[in-house]
Amino acid sequence: MTQVTIGENEGIESALRRFKRQVSKAGILRDLRNHRHFETNLEKRKRKAVAMRRNRRKSMA
C-alpha cells in the first residue's frame, strides 16, 4: 500500500505529486488495468506473443 506523510510546511500539491509518483513506480494502475477483466490463459499467451513481436520489431529498427 502506498502512503505519503505530509510534512508540517509541505503543501498538498507536492504531497499529491509524491503520491502519484509512488503509485506509478509501484505499477498499481497498470496492474489494475490488467485485472479489470478476466483473461484466459490463451488470451495471455496471445497478448504476450504480440508484445514479443512488437518488441522484436522495435529493437530491429
UniProtKB/Swiss-Prot annotation:
PROSITE patterns reported in the protein's UniProt record: RIBOSOMAL_S21
Record flagged with keyword Ribosomal protein: yes
Gene3D superfamilies (UniProt xref): Ribosomal protein S8 (1.20.5.1150)
Record Pfam families: Ribosomal_S21 (PF01165)
Entry keywords, A to Z: Ribonucleoprotein, Ribosomal protein
GO MF term list: structural constituent of ribosome
GO BP: translation
Family the UniProt entry places it in: Belongs to the bacterial ribosomal protein bS21 family.
Listed NCBIfam families: S21p (TIGR00030)
Name assigned to this protein: Small ribosomal subunit protein bS21
